[in-house]
């Protein structure tokens, strides 16, 4: 992500760094691959629970007198919080259930494994859940179930909601597809491919924030578990709540950081495609990642070939920075010595052009004097007139030279 000090530097490449040493594009690819692995594990876990429920016996799931089982499932809940789009679904796997809640009479239930812990409960079954019925949890089918507990005037109210694991598999599969789409877009420099997973991240961040706020404002299931626990308690409910809240806040900060990293990668790809203001990020600056970056460049080159080599041409233009040509007006003007070496008649018109001009002028004069003569007389008169004009010009030139020569020697020009 961009740092405040990096924004003040002149090198634009330092504006898009994450994890102190990675480029946002490399960080996005690593984050996407990690998410793909976690989601594949989560999908495998759901399939095992769906098709082979005996692998996860329900008598050990969330048992109130088994601290190890509860700790294991709460750790599993913390791991699933790292997966976008399943923050709400994984709660059904990790909430502490009550495996031996059975109907004793209309108003009394046996709670836990000890007959001395009989507590009055009031069932509040919502009409929106058709499958919501009071059941014996020890013989319940393999379904993902979550219980919400709350205190109301000295009594506890249990709302049993049953979820189908197929919905969780579908949602996680869509999230996995969008994550693969994001990795493909980051490798092939397609910025629009990052947007679907980015929106999932935004939605998941909002869900986590609401969950943390709900944990702070209401009685949590962890406090209820500690309050009703029959075995020894080694930690206070306040300390445990503080630990869980701290871990949740750290996960929320991590998700926000990953969200900003994906957004910076999107901005980097858009700037690199539209304006070409960013130079290529070379791996020689970070030698530890040279092998990994060489593999990514191979995929990037294949993506550029599919798009018509448009980006490669832009990169070549960006890398080459030729110096601008300066215009010097003195280079266009010839030197004075070169002009003096040019002969006087160097730019004279060709002879045939001069003869044509003189012939046309004499013909005009002859036509003005002898308009009624024949063509033969016109030709003769033209030749005679040309000779006379030449003689007159020579005489005038000699006369001017004689006048210049006869000028007194004591007269000096001004």
From Swiss-Prot:
Subcellular location: Cell membrane
PTM entry text: Phosphorylated on tyrosine residues.
Keywords associated with the record: Cell membrane, Membrane, Phosphoprotein, Receptor, Transmembrane, Transmembrane helix
Region entry Disordered, spans: 306-328
InterPro entries named in the record: LAPTM_transporter
Protein topology in the membrane: Multi-pass membrane protein
Residues spanning the signal sequence: none
TM region positions: 29-49, 167-187, 195-215, 242-262
Topology feature Extracellular, residues: 50-166, 216-241
GO terms for cellular component: lysosomal membrane; plasma membrane
Residue numbers on the Cytoplasmic membrane side: 1-28, 188-194, 263-414
Assembly and oligomerization: Interacts (via N-terminal extracellular domain) with human C2a.
Function: Cell surface receptor that binds to human complement C2a protein. This results in inhibition of the classical and lectin pathways of complement activation, probably due to interference with binding of C2a to C4b and interference with cleavage by C1 or MASP2 such that C3 convertase cannot be formed. This infers resistance to complement-mediated cell lysis, allowing parasite survival and infection.
Remarks, miscellaneous: Potential vaccine candidate molecule.
Entry protein name: Tetraspanning orphan receptor
Organism: Schistosoma japonicum
